Amino acid sequence: MRHRNGLRKLNRTSSHRLAMFRNLTNSLLEHEIIKTTLPKAKELRRVVEPVITLGKNPSLAGKRLAFDRLRNRDNVIKIFSELGPRYQNRNGGYIRILKCGFRRGDNAPMAIVELLDRPEAGIISNDSAD
C-alpha cells in the first residue's frame, strides 16, 4: 500500500529529479522569480522552504547542509546573508505559487514561483527628475 507517499515522480529517474530540483532551487534563489510547470512548482516548495529555514539560524552545520543541497556557493551566501534575516519572523511559507495559464506547445499548466517580500525590480524613482 502507498499510504502517505506524496512524492511526485514527474516521469524522471531519482537522479534526474534531484538535479532538476537543485537547478530550479538555484534559479529561484538567484532570480527570486521563475516560471515553470505547476506540478514542478508544487514539488519545488518542498525543496526550497527547508533550505531557506536553514538560513534563519546561521551555523556552520547549516551552511554545510545548504551547500550539500544546492552545490552553489553564491546561493548559500545569499541564503545566510539576505534571505535568513528577511524571513526571520516568518514561520514557513516563503514562496508564492501563481497559476499563469497553459504552455502553448503541450497545454501544460504553468505557474510563476516567487519569493515573498522580494524587492520590487523595475520601479523607477522620480527623485532625481527635478
Swiss-Prot record:
Keywords: Ribonucleoprotein, Ribosomal protein
Gene Ontology MF terms: structural constituent of ribosome
Family annotation (PROSITE patterns): RIBOSOMAL_L17
Subunit structure and binding partners: Part of the 50S ribosomal subunit. Contacts protein L32.
Family statement: Belongs to the bacterial ribosomal protein bL17 family.
PANTHER family: LARGE RIBOSOMAL SUBUNIT PROTEIN BL17M (PTHR14413:SF16), RIBOSOMAL PROTEIN L17 (PTHR14413)
Protein name per its UniProtKB record: Large ribosomal subunit protein bL17
Lineage, top ranks: Bacteria, Pseudomonadati, Pseudomonadota, Betaproteobacteria, Nitrosomonadales
